[in-house]
UniProtKB/Swiss-Prot annotation:
Protein topology in the membrane: Peripheral membrane protein
CDD domains, alphabetized: SEC14
Similarity comment text for this entry: Belongs to the SFH family.
Signal peptide residues on this chain, from the entry's feature table: none
Localization terms from the record: Golgi apparatus membrane; Cell membrane
Lineage: Eukaryota, Viridiplantae, Streptophyta, Embryophyta, Tracheophyta
Domain of life of the native organism: Eukaryota
SUPFAM superfamilies in alphabetical order: CRAL/TRIO domain, CRAL/TRIO N-terminal domain
Species in which this protein is naturally found: Arabidopsis thaliana (Mouse-ear cress)
UniProt protein name: Phosphatidylinositol/phosphatidylcholine transfer protein SFH2
Alphabetized UniProt keyword annotations: Cell membrane, Coiled coil, Golgi apparatus, Membrane, Protein transport, Transport
Length: 554
């Protein structure tokens, strides 16, 4: 009994000492309590705010047009990438993953292989830092001999890329730069397009933009425009674009195409995918009406039938006109706006706000006190040396305090003086953050095993020992399906052989065209020499006639 009394007195003295020390610090903690309350109120306000879109910033509203089926495919693709550790945070973008899926016709394994190759290429090529590391000083000279660049946007907000292939001088181009340097410049421009131009267009159009409209002017295109070096350059650029920046073309207009080009295109497009050919429109010299249906006249250069001249910037091909030149839009792009937040299938409000709060906390709440987590607040306001009797009495007094706010003083007196409003808000914050964190973790966990267990129980008999038995009907159906697949494979192999023959025929036709163009060039040269010789002979005959007349006069 005496020991119990001594222990009780020691504990009582300990509490008295703590209370006296805490009273001295109570005034200092008032400001911390107020800051914690303000931070909690702001968090609660963000939880109840309505009308927030899936955007990283509240002030820019961007429409995301991905449908449910595509979102399901992206979600499955994302889980596969996470399992194989192929998803850096920089590339955790559902639009980027969707482009790779579309490029491989939603074949998960092929898209994953393409994604892996892209990551390896970016690491080896240094694409992530090429905007800062590479300086293309010869750009002014290059544009003279290879007129190309972005100019304006179409009516749907996509940037317009223009190339005047008929004015390409490959010989002079290779004198001012090299193939490697131009390819690096091309990659740098593509990175700039994804990091600056597409987000700027998305902000201006208020819808997600990650594709462009291309115009190729082929007037005057011939063998003289493209030597071997130029062909190698175009092949290198095309390979990089197809392998690492897929599905960035929305539509392409090939203008000023002659009869020969159209005939060749009709032959070539039979070997291309129908979706690809649907994007390409081959037009003659009456293309203005078609372009103006897609592009506003003020956004289209004058030499293509529009009204824009960009006289103050040295011409349309040098102006780089577009919303990315707007200072306000460019500032928003630099702040990380113009990008859609990764969407999920569940649509849980807490998860979206949690991600939004983590990503924009520094912009929306610049005060240093708002950077404290719920766990840190709880550590500041909770003392571990709480008397057991006081802790047991806490729920009862808290219920009374909820009914009568004036009893809050009694509630706080049951525990350490540090545990007042800070404890309440800290506990709520910790609980809320814990729930949201668990929801995020469980949602992003791989679901292959779960799905396998679910689907294995549908349409089959499972005994208690876990052995699955296949019925006779299921076996027959499976054999029939395998037979059908084998027939389809054989049919595809036959079609592949047929396409190989057509490709060989096309290659032979292209070689024949090259030979004919070479013969035509030689014939023109011989004809010019013959004409020159004929003029010399005529001049000689005329000279002889004059001498003969003089002789007859004498």
């Amino acid at each position: 009994m005496a020991d119990t009394m001594v222990a009780h007195m020691d504990r009582h003295n300990k509490i008295d000492v703590e209370i006296s020390e805490d009273d001295k610090r109570l005034t200092k903690l008032c400001s911390l309590k107020k800051k914690a309350i303000n931070a909690t109120n702001k968090f609660k306000h963000s939880m109840t705010k309505k009308g927030r879109r899936h955007s990283r910033v509240a002030c820019v509203s961007i429409v995301d047009e991905i449908d449910t089926e595509e979102l399901q495919a992206v979600d499955a693709f994302r889980q596969a990438l996470i399992l194989d550790e192929l998803l850096p945070s920089k590339h955790d973008d559902h639009h980027m993953m969707l482009r790779f899926l579309r490029a491989r016709k939603f074949d998960l394994e092929k898209a994953k292989q393409m994604w892996s190759d892209m990551l390896n290429w970016r690491k080896e090529y240094g694409a992530d830092t090429i905007m800062e590391d590479f300086d293309f000083k010869e750009i002014e000279e290059v544009v003279k001999y290879y007129p190309q660049g972005y100019h304006g946007v179409d009516k749907e907000g996509r940037p317009i890329y223009i190339e005047r292939l008929g004015q390409v001088d490959a010989t002079k181009l290779m004198k001012v730069t090299t193939i490697d340097r131009y390819v690096k410049y091309h990659v740098k421009e593509f990175e700039k397009t994804f990091n600056v131009k597409f987000p700027a267009c998305s902000i201006a159009a208020k819808r997600h933009i990650d594709q462009s409209t291309t115009i190729l002017d082929v007037q005057g295109v011939g063998l003289s425009n493209f030597n071997k070096a130029a062909k190698d350059l175009l092949q290198s650029i095309q390979k990089i674009d197809n392998d690492n920046y897929p599905e960035t073309l929305n539509r392409m207009f090939i203008i000023n195409a002659g009869c020969g080009f159209r005939l060749l295109w009709n032959t070539v497009k039979s070997f291309l995918d129908p979706k690809t050919t649907a994007k390409i429109h081959v037009l003659g010299n009456k293309y203005q009406t078609k372009l103006l249906e897609i592009i506003d006249a003020n956004e289209l250069p004058e030499f293509l039938g529009g009204k824009c001249t960009c006289a103050d910037k040295g011409g349309c091909m040098r102006s780089d006109k577009g919303p990315w030149n707007d200072p306000e839009i460019f500032k928003l792009v630099q702040n990380g706006e113009g990008r859609c937040l990764r969407r999920s299938l569940s649509g849980i409000e807490e998860k979206t706000i949690f991600e939004y709060n983590n990503e924009t906390k520094k912009k929306c709440e610049p005060e240093e006190t708002h950077k404290q987590s719920a766990a840190e607040m709880e550590k500041k306001f909770i003392d571990t040396n709480v008397d057991a009797a006081a802790a047991a009495d806490w729920p009862t007094k808290l219920n009374k305090a909820e009914k009568n706010p004036t009893d809050l003083k009694d509630v706080y007196s049951a525990v350490n003086p540090l545990e007042r409003k800070g404890y309440l808000y800290g506990s709520v914050m910790a609980l809320l953050m814990g729930i949201v964190g668990v929801m995020r973790l469980t949602k992003n966990m791989p679901r292959r095993l779960t799905e396998a267990n679910v689907y294995s129980r549908e349409g089959s008999a499972v005994y208690q020992d876990g052995v699955t038995v296949m019925s006779k009907q299921e076996y027959i159906a499976m054999v029939k399906k395998i037979t059908d697949l084998e027939e389809k494979c054989k049919s595809m192999e036959a079609q592949a052989a047929f396409y190989m023959e057509r490709e060989k025929t096309l290659d032979a036709a292209l070689r024949r065209i090259d030979q004919l163009e070479l013969q035509l060039s030689e014939t023109n040269k011989a004809l010019d020499e013959t004409m020159t010789r004929q003029h010399e002979i005529m001049a000689f005959i005329e000279k002889k006639k004059k001498k003969k007349r003089k002789f007859l006069l004498f």
